[in-house]
């Protein structure tokens, strides 16, 4: 299930530099940008989409010849071997058990996820509601599956969502293997288990509304549509193998999948770009690369699109933090304990320091009300980079592994995910349901067991049916917008 990868020089300090990852780079680029191109083709006017697509192609392709000699001297990094199929199968199972595909009982957030896919399959693109408003939502994750659904039906689209998400997770795992210098099944497990030490935080009675950095399994269950693309981009970024001229374009694509994640990850993207720009042979030429204007134009189009949403103005600003003892415990158990393992190897890595600074400063800012959306979504980039550093530390230092696994066991967030997995089947959920006469268990083990196995709210979330048009629902303004004249100039509304 695991194996060390060959290196051109024994004892090389950077094992991630030891292999040719051309195929992995282009697979990652295609996974991130294909939905963007679909969106441009069906949502934008041709006089905007065609020049922009051409500029993007030039930005991605230029500079490729200079990298060929270095690539040819390295052993290839195959996408598939026997362990790869096991990992891909495990990620497919994770997507299904997390509710994607609608085959099992789901978390309540899937009321919107299910309706979005059905709307995209059933409606012409761009989606215009009967009252003239338009769908404004980060639909990128569903566009390729929905395109398949328009040809072959909703059932195919649902299956494609699972496969599309599993492929994104698979690519992220491969980048962890590249960065750590070790292709290991256990790195896939580490990736899924990574997150805040939620069990420990709950036992201490900490206020999770003040700081809750969602783990990988939580992100996949609730918002794989936004989190998987962002995780993939920032793990790729942390590996140091992303071509500098790709960074602006692929970062602009993350704004399509999650604007708040792009905001939270902006310092990390800038830091890594500067780090690689300083090390390039032609730094001045990099500043005038065509990928920059392409990224600016693409980002501006996404910004105008999301700005047209009908949602009430978001409450945003800053708030005091680290004013209570529990705040320090939250920061420590959310990510600082993981960072301690990585400090020895990466304390001189500017991206690692920037990751720590971003994770420490994010709690001072908020967007929206009691649930801080900036922490929920804007923390994904920092956590993805920290995951990459932790995976590399895990591979380099076998003596630390038992301690890392112990932390991950506390960070698996079983209170959140595992009950849904246990209640994925209605029959199993009925079996686990406590009787009406059963009082709240008094012992700690019994309470923990119930938290671990039973989610009464798990069911097929189909209240919205086949459409996102529900004007009376309090969530509807967040997914609809009134097209303005300037928006109609860019988009085919």
Where are the language model's segments positioned?
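Membrane-embedded, hydrophobic transmembrane alpha-helices
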Residues: 1-77, 194
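Membrane-interfacial loop-to-transmembrane alpha-helix junctions, especially the N-terminal start
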Residues: 18-30, 75-85, 184-186, 244-247, ...
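Transmembrane helical bundles and short interhelical boundary loops of multi-pass, membrane-embedded
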Residues: 30, 38-43, 297-493
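Transmembrane signal-anchor helices characteristic of membrane glycosylation enzymes that use polyprenol
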Residues: 35-45, 56-63, 80-108, 168-173, ...
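Membrane-interface alpha helices of multi-pass inner-membrane proteins
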Residues: 35-40, 234-239, 244-270
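Transmembrane alpha-helical segments
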Residues: 59-61, 168-179, 229-241, 267-274, ...
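Active-site lumenal/periplasmic loops and adjacent helix-entry segments of GT-C-fold
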Residues: 97-231
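Perimembrane helix-loop-helix junctions
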Residues: 264-294
């Amino acid at each position: 299930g695991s194996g060390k990868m060959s290196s051109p020089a024994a004892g090389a300090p950077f094992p991630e530099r030891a292999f040719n990852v051309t195929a992995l780079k282009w697979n990652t680029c295609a996974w991130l940008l294909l939905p963007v191109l679909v969106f441009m083709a069906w949502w934008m006017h041709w006089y905007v989409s065609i020049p922009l697509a051409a500029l993007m192609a030039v930005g991605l392709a230029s500079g490729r010849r200079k990298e060929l000699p270095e690539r040819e001297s390295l052993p290839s990094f195959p996408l598939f071997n026997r362990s790869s199929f096991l990992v891909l199968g495990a990620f497919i199972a994770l997507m299904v058990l997390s509710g994607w595909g609608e085959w099992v009982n789901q978390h309540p957030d899937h009321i919107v996820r299910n309706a979005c896919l059905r709307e995209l399959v059933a409606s012409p693109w761009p989606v215009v509601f009967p009252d003239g408003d338009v769908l404004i939502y980060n639909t990128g994750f569903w566009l390729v599956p929905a395109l398949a659904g328009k040809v072959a039906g909703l059932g195919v689209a649902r299956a494609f969502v699972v496969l599309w998400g599993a492929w994104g997770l698979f690519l992220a795992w491969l980048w962890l293997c590249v960065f750590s210098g070790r292709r290991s099944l256990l790195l896939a497990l580490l990736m899924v288990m990574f997150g805040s030490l939620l069990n420990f935080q709950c036992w201490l009675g900490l206020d999770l509304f003040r700081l809750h950095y969602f783990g990988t399994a939580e992100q996949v269950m609730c918002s794989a549509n936004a989190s998987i693309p962002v995780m993939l981009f920032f793990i790729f970024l942390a590996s140091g193998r992303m071509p500098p001229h790709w960074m602006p374009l692929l970062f602009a694509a993350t704004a399509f999948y999650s604007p708040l994640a792009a905001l939270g990850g902006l310092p990390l993207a800038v830091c890594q770009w500067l780090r690689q720009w300083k090390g390039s042979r032609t730094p001045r030429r990099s500043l005038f690369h065509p990928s920059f204007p392409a990224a600016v134009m693409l980002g501006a189009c996404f910004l105008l699109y999301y700005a047209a949403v009908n949602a009430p103005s978001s409450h945003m600003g800053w708030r005091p933090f680290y004013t209570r003892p529990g705040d320090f415990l939250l920061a420590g158990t959310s990510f600082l304990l993981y960072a301690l393992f990585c400090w020895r190897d990466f304390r001189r890595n500017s991206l690692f320091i920037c990751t720590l600074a971003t994770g420490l400063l994010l709690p001072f800012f908020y967007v929206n009300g009691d649930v801080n959306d900036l922490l929920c979504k804007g923390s994904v980039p920092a956590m993805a980079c920290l995951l990459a550093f932790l995976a590399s530390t895990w591979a380099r230092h076998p003596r630390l592994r038992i301690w890392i696994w112990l932390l991950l066991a506390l960070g698996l967030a079983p209170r959140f995910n595992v009950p849904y997995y246990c209640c994925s089947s209605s029959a199993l959920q009925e079996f686990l349901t406590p009787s009406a006469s059963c009082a709240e268990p008094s012992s700690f083990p019994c309470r923990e067991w119930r938290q671990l196995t039973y989610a009464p709210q798990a069911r097929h979330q189909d209240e919205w049916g086949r459409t996102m048009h529900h004007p009376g629902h309090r969530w509807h303004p967040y997914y609809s917008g009134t097209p303005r004249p300037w928006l109609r100039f860019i988009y085919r509304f």
